[in-house]
Amino acid sequence: GAAFAMATVTDGQETSDGATLTYPVVKADAPEAQQRINTVIEDDVKAFMQEIDAARVAGKPPAAKMSYEITKSSDELLSLKTEQFISEESAAHPMSYAHGYIFRLSDGKALTLADVQQLPDRKEHASRYTLESLNKRLAEPKDGAAKDFKKLETAPKDIYMDANGHIHVLIQRYEAASYAA
């Protein structure tokens, strides 16, 4: 395939009363890929802003912030991790979410664990990236499984790749344990 240049990432920012959201804006060689990538990120930003607005409407103005880091960038893939934090005025616990993305720069697709299995350098280890293998590893106490750990029903969509090419799976607290408010 044609070689693509690495994507460039700049800060996008939304600020409003008590909230500062900094998110990645991606510029890629292929315009359709660029649009696809930015739409995925914008949808997550919008969903978080709706949560912030809902708290305001409920009369609990929150402090909220969002940040991101680029975890891996090559001429084929761009991987990002975002952190979202919201603390409502009277809530016992602040909530935090981490989202991970691996985007393919040729078409902008956000890769899933199933897609990762198909990457040329992963095929021989494809079984590592299955839901079954993930649940097995999560259930091992050394991986910090909560006592009330419940198996994941579906493969987590929040994944990212680090600089060494390792795949990290982010599991939201509410996906793997019962959450007591």
Predicted regions and their residues:
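Compositionally biased intrinsically disordered regions enriched in Thr/Gly
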Residues: 1-181
